[in-house]
Regions:
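Internal acidic/polar
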Residues: 3, 89-114, 118
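A short, charge-rich alpha-helical start-of-domain segment used by transcription regulators
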Residues: 7-31, 128
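Sigma70-family region 2
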Residues: 11-12, 51-66, 86
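Amphipathic, Lys/Arg- and hydrophobic-enriched alpha-helical face
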Residues: 22-40, 57, 120, 169-172
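Structural recognition of an alpha-helix C-terminal capping motif at a helix-to-coil junction
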Residues: 31, 45-52, 65-77
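Arg/Lys-rich amphipathic alpha helix in sigma70-family domain 2
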Residues: 59-62, 73-93, 161
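DNA-recognition helix of helix-turn-helix
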Residues: 80, 127, 146-173
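A short pre-motif secondary-structure segment
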Residues: 130-134
Length: 177
């Protein structure tokens, strides 16, 4: 059974189809949330709430996007709400930096991994989220804009500023060759 068929059956109340959808997409949601929160404990809370919201709102899902994108959007919103409530940003885990980059590949290859993480952790959530979605999960700008509920131009600007900040900070620390 393909994803669209599972979605239609889940919308009709088929618990088995919904369970299959959630099981297939759980690793993607979990990986993203752990990376964005940096804390397995916080991630567990966000994931549980996101899955609950997905179950309760399955009939509202519009299959124009992938189911995993919808789950990540819900998870992002849950975490964003949590940040608003707690007014603190949780650091990222050290496994956030992916090995394969596009334009940043040269810059990233010259830097100390830990320093990049420290710099990334000091940035606002919005910039971190864009960086993670683009470079770790290889989402397109349009998909990131939908997930974060902002214009594509804002996504591009946040990513550009994030990379610019990383480069600037590394130059300041005299780590660029």
């Amino acid at each position: 059974m393909d994803e669209l068929e599972l979605i239609e059956r889940a919308k009709e109340g088929n618990k088995s189809a919904l369970n299959t959808l959630l099981t297939q997409n759980f690793p993607i949601l979990k990986g993203y949330i752990i990376k964005i929160t940096g804390s397995p404990d916080v991630a567990q809370d966000v994931i549980q709430e996101a899955l609950l919201k997905a179950v309760l709102n399955i009939k509202k899902f519009n299959p124009k996007a992938k189911f995993s994108t919808w789950l990540i959007t819900i998870g992002t919103n849950v975490y964003r709400d949590m940040l608003r409530k707690t007014k603190r940003i949780v650091p990222l885990e050290e496994d956030i930096i992916a090995e394969d980059y596009n334009t940043e590949k040269i810059v990233m290859s010259n830097m100390e991994y830990k320093e990049i993480l420290d710099i990334l952790n000091s940035m606002p959530y919005e910039k971190k989220a864009v960086f993670i979605l683009k470079h770790y999960y290889n989402y397109k700008y349009e998909e990131i804009a939908k997930i974060l509920n902002c214009p594509i131009g804002t996504v591009r600007s946040r990513l550009h500023n994030c990379i610019k900040n990383i480069i600037s900070e590394l130059e300041r620390k005299d780590m660029m060759r």
